[in-house]
Structure formats: C-alpha cells, structure tokens
Amino acid sequence: NGVIQTELARLAVEHQVYLLAGSIPLKSAIMDKYYNAALMYAPDGNLLCAYNKIHLFKFNDGVVAYDEGVNFVAGDKVICCEIDGFKVGLSICYDLRFPELFRVMGVVDVILLPSAFTYQTGLAHWELLARARAVENQCYFVAVNQGGEHESGRKTYGHSLICDPWGEVLASCA
C-alpha cells in the first residue's frame, strides 16, 4: 500500500469507477526483483484484484535489446474478477502473444490488457493479436497501449483499441 496505490484508490472513489492501473512495479519476495502488476480498484476504493504479469518481455534485434527479467519476476496465477456481473480477465503487454494464458481464463466477458508495446513490435502485431484474442476467446478485448517517444529514445506504439468477439475493432485511438 504505497503512495501510488493510495492515489489510485482515491481516484476510483472520487470518480466512482472501476480503475485498472498497470503496469505498476510491486516488490516481490526476491531481492531487487519486482512484479509487473495490474491493479483493479472498485468504486469504493478497495483493491478488487491484482495480476502479476506471467510472460516477461525479452527482445534483441541486434540494435535494440531489452530483458524484463533483469528487474522483474514472473507471476504464476491467471486472474479474473467479477465487475457488476461481468467476468473480467486481466493480462499485461507481452502476455498478448500467448493464447494459452487467455484460454485458461475460461469463459470471460471481457479481457483487459494494459501495455507498452514497442513501436516495432506494435506495428507488426498489435492489432492482429488483439483481434485474434477476442475471436479465440469469444469476448470483448480492451487493449490499451502507451504511445510516444520516451526520454531514453524508446518509442511505444500506441493505437489502443476495443475489439468485439467477432474481432471487429469497435473503437481505437492513436
């Protein structure tokens, strides 16, 4: 229950919304390692559920390299929660590439995926994979992706979208 979590809970209460925040680094039991977490707050400010990212991102194209496992430890539990009678599955970023994670959720109404896909990987696979997960699981799929250029020079793709169970994009924004 740190400063960020307290503020997220306050915002959920103030706006009377369910609030998914992710990803947020949370300390793990392993020294100097964190979980990459998505936290779902209810309108009363209580933490409804938390998901620790299972699939850690590792990328090296000879020019750019990144290994999430240097700082993070993988979660080991698939998490779903109920919101106003709807079963909601949680996932984070690179999890999108692993369809078996979503199948283990069982029947869900919607899957939420906060993400920071790189420009390169997003351009190649972002919409394709989000639409595929919606179709495979016959549910709505909300994929929120950070976009822009960071101080480090890293570029994220953006292009957040909502897909229906047929794989149609209902809404998107850059």
Model-derived segments and spans:
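Well-ordered beta-strand positions
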Residues: P25, C80-E82, L161
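Short Pro/Gly-enriched beta-strand edge/turn motifs at strand-loop
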Residues: L19-L26, K58-A65, F141-N145
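Active-site catalytic loop in hydrolytic enzyme cores
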Residues: T6, R10, A29-G106, Y119-L128
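Short glycine/acidic-enriched loop and turn motifs that connect beta-strands
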Residues: L26-A29, E149
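CN hydrolase (nitrilase-like) catalytic-core segments centered on the catalytic cysteine
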Residues: G2-A21, L96-A174
